[in-house]
């Protein structure tokens, strides 16, 4: 038996050495060769607003510049696109193997029968197709290993994008790009009439439910072609050339292409006719893409999409990657606003400075004027400190999911929100947005938030409006009359972001919640009388908070439970050692934490006392008086 164990042990060691040795040998062999040459083919029209980012991120690619050549064309532009391209070439053109460019600043700004710069007329299709065919010919002439067809709407934020794509050695591959919506640069389905077809696989790839490189019927906008593949000579964007190629391959018994003279569809069908697979790769977060505009759209809509993309970069990457120094003066952020509210607070833990910085980056990109509010840190609380504050817990409370008592993190979270309610009353702030520091904003947040607020003010009195939450799916939530973006809120988790009125703050303080404490996201549904636990609700006699919710929601958590990067300071903190009728209490898995600032103990006690005294004025107040 022992001899067998020794034998198998030696066998495993030998196998490991062989595999590891092969990997090392392969790596050494690869290091002996130059990276493949890449021709970047770029067509530009009216892209001055995005070119500084596009060119900066392209230049920042971790790929030898002497192995990259450019083929650039810019025409029919009425903005500063040509000037920006010339500026970039002046600074960086000599870094690359070669640059072939042609800029037409004297020609017409529009195409025949064009209704707007975003209209794709027949003449525009013909012109673009001819240019792409020219780029293909040039790539063959200079013996490029790859040609990378790029639109200027592509922002390759991953510096490993080009190196990763070329290493795949696929005949045709596109990096999967993110947008403000579900739009991307690939299709997973195509109808017999060459239209886009919805599939379940599309979302799986887009949301990276599965990771890798996947065969698809269509890629566009950012497409890398291996020019050394035998079938590459048959790839084309031209409809007539595709038909000619198909006719010359009659032995394949293929019907001639009868579809539209659309460059991306023709390219996909030419690959299909030649038996060349198209792939999309989502192994990296390669970057972002702007959605194409329709003929009736405006430049302002493109700028708004770019703002949304920059906000997504902050949420995904922590900050917008910087542009080249000489382009920095061209990067503008919107003027900051309070969304027609009196104030906006963001609750943040002092020991989470990275979250604060990320949120401040986000506010800068979106244009929000927000005050940082130091959170009460559960790690600085203990049972003695809690008792000194006069805090008592609701008898019988236990967390609905984990069946445990409250944690110090949850206590700190409640006190943080409570302090803002007190501040509102002190300063007589009529409407306030309260944000936590682990959120991402939905696209067009500013405009949608103002619309929701105006609807609420015009059609109904309110105390609280959820901007972000997790609703109980079974709960019925009727629409607010005469409003298309508001519902009457049902039982909800999380306090990611909500608008609170002064009247609402007074109602919450009047309930004296520190005398029967429960987590803040359980307390709020109790106060608008939609909590399913009637034992808890019975402890709060007056439950007349008027609570609404934006529909759809306007903000979401950055991470959900179980996802990479998810941290909960409320759930992972120490539990209280206080007896309740049911013994234990618990935490919600998807709620984030809040914390306490050193040196604020005295201020906190004063505010707690003031909150209790202020709550006594509530019965004499009406909505009209406030």
Curated annotation (Swiss-Prot):
Keywords: Endoplasmic reticulum, Glycoprotein, Glycosyltransferase, Signal, Transferase
Matches recorded under PROSITE patterns: ER_TARGET
Glycosylation sites: 113, 234, 272, 533
EC number, UniProt record: 2.-.-.-
GO molecular function ontology, one term from the record: procollagen galactosyltransferase activity
One Gene Ontology cellular component: endoplasmic reticulum lumen
Pfam families assigned: Glyco_transf_25 (PF01755)
Prevents secretion from ER, short sequence motif: residues: 623-626
Localization in the cell: Endoplasmic reticulum lumen
Domain of life per record: Eukaryota
Principal location listed in the UniProt entry: endoplasmic reticulum
Span of the signal peptide: 1-21
InterPro entries assigned: Collagen_mod_GT25 (IPR050757), Glyco_trans_25 (IPR002654), Nucleotide-diphossugar_trans (IPR029044)
Similarity comment: family membership: Belongs to the glycosyltransferase 25 family.
Protein name: Glycosyltransferase 25 family member
